[in-house]
């Protein structure tokens, strides 16, 4: 009986194939890993975690996690959608200092092409700020993020959020309210994608 169980396991492994997991085109179609499956359709919907460092071959950026979701399998390649990113807890702890203020915001924004994204920007001040300054900086963060999302498509906005251009835009304006030490987009998460466009109704036949 034991031999039969072992043989069934071996047969199961033999029936599976390897699939490369590919990042989206705007993330350079980097291969972020591989997995085995007997039925490739079972891979669809699976979340994959990687880092910006692995996507760009820059190990200094391994403190930024990127979440991808498999959306299709073509041949031996599993393609993915970007679902968001998050800075590691250790990295956030490393930039928190005493006698300073940490200012967090949590905002749902809509991109020009209809994606709903939850964005969590964070500012770190040089010294402790007053409550009125904290409120003003938080409002400015929210306004900058919402405005940029409304102007950009999904791919552009997510690249700016993950690679630091959005946080730099916040820093340039918010530092005039109170001196800032650092600004980060701590997390993004795709909440909803636009519905597929309905196909045009056929024109009525000529009488």
UniProtKB/Swiss-Prot annotation:
Sorted alphabetically, which SMART domains does this protein's record hold? Ribosomal_S3Ae (SM01397)
State one molecular function term (GO).
structural constituent of ribosome
Keywords attached to this entry: Ribonucleoprotein, Ribosomal protein
Q: Would the keyword Transferase be found if you checked this record's keyword annotation? A: no
Q: Which GO terms describe its biological process?
A: translation
Q: Which PROSITE patterns does the record associate with it? A: RIBOSOMAL_S3AE
Answer whether the UniProt record assigns the keyword Ribosomal protein to this protein.
yes
Do you know which Pfam families this protein is assigned to?
Ribosomal_S3Ae (PF01015)
Q: Which GO terms describe its cellular component?
A: ribonucleoprotein complex; ribosome
- Similarity-based family: Belongs to the eukaryotic ribosomal protein eS1 family.
Record's HAMAP family? Ribosomal_eS1
The record's listing under NCBIfam families reads: PRK04057.1 (NF003142)
Q: What protein is this chain from? A: Small ribosomal subunit protein eS1
The species this protein was found in = Methanosarcina barkeri (strain Fusaro / DSM 804)
């Amino acid at each position: 009986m034991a031999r039969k169980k072992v043989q069934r396991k071996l047969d199961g492994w033999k029936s599976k194939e390897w699939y490369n997991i590919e990042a989206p085109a705007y993330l350079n179609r980097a291969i972020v890993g591989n997995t085995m499956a007997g039925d490739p359709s079972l891979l669809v919907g699976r979340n994959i975690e990687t880092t910006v460092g692995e996507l760009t071959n820059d190990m200094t950026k391994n403190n930024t996690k990127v979440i991808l979701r498999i959306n299709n399998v073509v041949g031996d390649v599993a393609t993915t959608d970007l679902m968001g990113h998050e800075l590691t807890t250790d990295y956030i702890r490393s930039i928190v200092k005493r006698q300073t203020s940490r200012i967090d915001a949590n905002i749902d924004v809509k991109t020009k092409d209809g994606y709903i994204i939850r964005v969590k920007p964070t500012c770190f001040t040089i010294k402790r700020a007053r409550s009125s300054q904290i409120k003003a900086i938080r409002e400015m963060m929210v306004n900058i993020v919402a405005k940029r999302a409304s102007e950009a498509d999904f791919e552009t906005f997510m690249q700016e959020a993950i690679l630091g251009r959005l946080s730099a835009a916040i820093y340039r304006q918010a530092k005039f309210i109170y001196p800032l030490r650092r600004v980060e987009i701590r997390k993004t998460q795709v909440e909803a994608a636009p519905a597929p466009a309905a196909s045009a109704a056929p024109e009525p036949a000529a009488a």
